[in-house]
Amino acid sequence: MFDLEYQLKNLPDKPGVYLMKNNLGEIIYVGKAKILKNRVRQYFQKSQKHSEKVKAMVKNIEEFEYIITDSEIEALILECNLIKKYRPKYNILLKDDKHYPFIKVTLAEDFPRVISTRKVTKDGSKYFGPYVDGSSVKDIIELIKKTFPIRTCKKNIVEGAKAIRPCLNYQIGLCKAPCAQYIKKSEYREIIDDVIKLLSGKHLDIVENFKLNMEKAAGNLEFEKAAMLRDKINIIEKIGEKQKIILNNFDNEDYISLYSDGKDTCFQVFFLRNGKIVGREHFIIEDTFDTNSSTLISNFLKEFYGGTAYIPKTIYVPNIEDEVLLEQWLTLKKESKSTIKIPIKGEKKNILDLVEKNAKTTLENFKLKYLQEKALYDNVLKDLKNILRLQEEPIRIEAFDISNIQGFDSVGSMVVFEKGRAKPSDYRRFKINTVKGADDYKSMKEILTRRFQHGLSEIKSIQDRKLEFSSGKFSVFPDLILMDGGKGQINIALEVLNTFNINIPVCGMVKDNKHRTRGLIYNGEEIIINKYGSVMKFITRVQDEVHRFAISYHRSLRGKNSFHSLLDDIPNIGEKRKKDLLFNFKSIDNIKKATYEELLSISSMDKKSAESILEFFK
């Protein structure tokens, strides 16, 4: 048994990391300390300085562990790693550990490419970003490919190497074919220099040059060439408009601020690269209560930069805790100097104020939307209770569906809605184990049996250990079950529930002959719900979601198991090469007819794999 008083007395006088646990043994908080003895004891001392969140956490602490480190910076690194590993309830956690996309120009290559990446390394390449919107990176790269004749293949092309036959991109004017040695390295680099200028925001120079060439072409009556240059000018201007210059310096900087309303906090991040805003992002952290802003920002920085691929040269914040220590940690991660600054006045302070205003607006809009949705969902659940004559509003709803094609790879899905909102963390997928062929009823019986068997086992385990009730994977039962089907599916569900002596109302979601949600079946009767507009929309959403979830799982299994072709029998041809070959050649017959050079034009192919194909079809 854990003796709290004894453990507190024997805490070491050293730096380290502490892990707080609840009565289930779950890690609910991870922290670091310069002196473990002082920091951990503070939690258990009565103090008005404790925030509401800390007080709530302390009530749930059953025991703690600690790990001694050689220094405070080592403790900080370990803390970040453990938070990422355990995702403790009372730490600041960002919902998505984002690695933002960058545009990478591979300058270490003789003939560089322009690609998207989420990993920044010291490899001689030039990186532009991060971009918050991944689709904008894709759009920009596609626009660059249309404007500048640069290669898109992954071949290792070196100036002076043996020439190979160029691909289709050369034929249609999208590439200068360095693979065929049709362009010198120096000439190709001039094109890449223009790409870098464009990505650096210096697009006006390129536009001016293109305009001169366009006018010259028009003067020579080369109207087709002039029109092509005009289109390229429009594309370049479109890329240039995506980024607005707001500073005259050219540093890479992040501006981070926050706004708290007493309960929740919104963090806002502005990414400035080369004096331009390239993106912004916000994160809403609930239940921060009266935690001071310097602590919040310190914790946010650890979580945010612990999971990002890129750390800027300078980070501006309104205030912060552990500034020197965090700078050391950021510099270690970046492998070059990174500085945290608190601007007092001037344009940097003005930008930070703007970031805070955006955080305030974002939080207010989030709350407004939340309240509007809550009112809507409250009414939906109230109407659903009345329509079905339930004793209570169905706070937790679980829906089930089966998916298969001609009896292969049958799968089941369970989606969960709580208080009217989808709860993806509780979604579950089931691969059918006991049923052969296409039998939806037996398949449904299997997944429902597994779902409630697991739930009862979890509940028994919690009761046997005399623990507080805690939601496991299946231990929280629904207030209402929705089946994607009619009376047959309902009867299967009721049969399973009766087996376990569980009493939960079960409805069937039925569709019309156009496959649209028509109504509900409950207690053997069909209930028309189209006069309840919001209920109809909600049931349609649930039905679509459970179907989508089942289909997505089925497709993933089908993709792994059901496709076999002649290519699977060829040595040195794996999944990646098989997909690339079929994508480019469209059929096995075309692959059979392909020449050695045509096979090598596929980015994932090498000499050995091309020779294997030629040998196989010989």
Swiss-Prot record:
Please name the SUPFAM superfamilies in this protein's record.
C-terminal UvrC-binding domain of UvrB, GIY-YIG endonuclease, RuvA domain 2-like
Q: What is its main location?
A: cytoplasm
Q: What's a Pfam family this protein contains?
A: GIY-YIG
Spell out the subcellular localization from the entry: Cytoplasm
CDD domains listed in its UniProt record? GIY-YIG_UvrC_Cho
Domain of life of the organism encoding this protein: Bacteria
Please give a single GO biological process term from the UniProt record. Answer: nucleotide-excision repair
Entry GO MF terms: DNA binding; excinuclease ABC activity
Similarity remark: Belongs to the UvrC family.
| The protein, known as | UvrABC system protein C
Query: What's the source species for this entry?
Result: Clostridium botulinum (strain 657 / Type Ba4)
Gene name for this UniProt entry: uvrC
